[in-house]
Amino acid sequence: MQKEVESLFGAIETRIHSTLQRLPAPEGVVYACGFWLFYCDYTVLGVPCFAYNTVGNENDTKWSPSEWIVDVADEMTEVLKPLYEQVSSLMAGKDDAAWEALIEYQWNVYSKVCISLNASVKQGRGPLAHWYLTEDFVIGIFEEQADDDMYDFLVKASVGEKAALELGIV
């Protein structure tokens, strides 16, 4: 991956953390946050949506961010959009293989961010420390548009295989 792209994804990670810290605590107890709707048409890399849901609002959609109480947190999108525009500009004219490598790189970055955030939550610290969270809270990648194998892979990569199985996500 290009150094400039890696640097931008470092800035994306920093902005995710700072935005989570600034977001007001939702009413209720949050059991999950997730990134979903990762978009790429090989000319533009879109900002994935950030969502969360609270206990009592899960019904049949417990792991379906598009149905959660907050399916798109606009503040996260707005703060990440300029960085994603820069990534897309750096990728202009690249072939499909380069874009596919970028998509995989993005998933790896987001998986690592989620694993790190999950660890900080378990220790009672980090950018979500001001939210009311369940004991088994997770933040992960819940990419509903992916096929089942890719969905399962991304969930396990972002929340850990043990948590994914214990919570019945996969």
Give the location of each predicted region:
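Short, hydrophobic/proline-enriched secondary-structure or compact coil segments at domain edges
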Residues: 35, 110, 117, 136-143
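Polybasic, proline/glycine-rich intrinsically disordered low-complexity segments
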Residues: 53-122
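Soluble secreted/lumenal catalytic domains
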Residues: 41, 80, 117, 157-163
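Glycine-rich, aromatic-bearing surface loops/beta-hairpins
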Residues: 126-170
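N-terminal interaction modules that seed assembly of large macromolecular complexes
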Residues: 25-62
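Long, hydrophobic, amphipathic alpha-helical segments used as structural scaffolds
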Residues: 23, 27, 118-121, 125
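Short N-terminal edge-element motif at the start of the domain
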Residues: 1-30
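Sequence-level detector for tyrosine residue identity
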Residues: 31, 39-42, 52, 84, ...
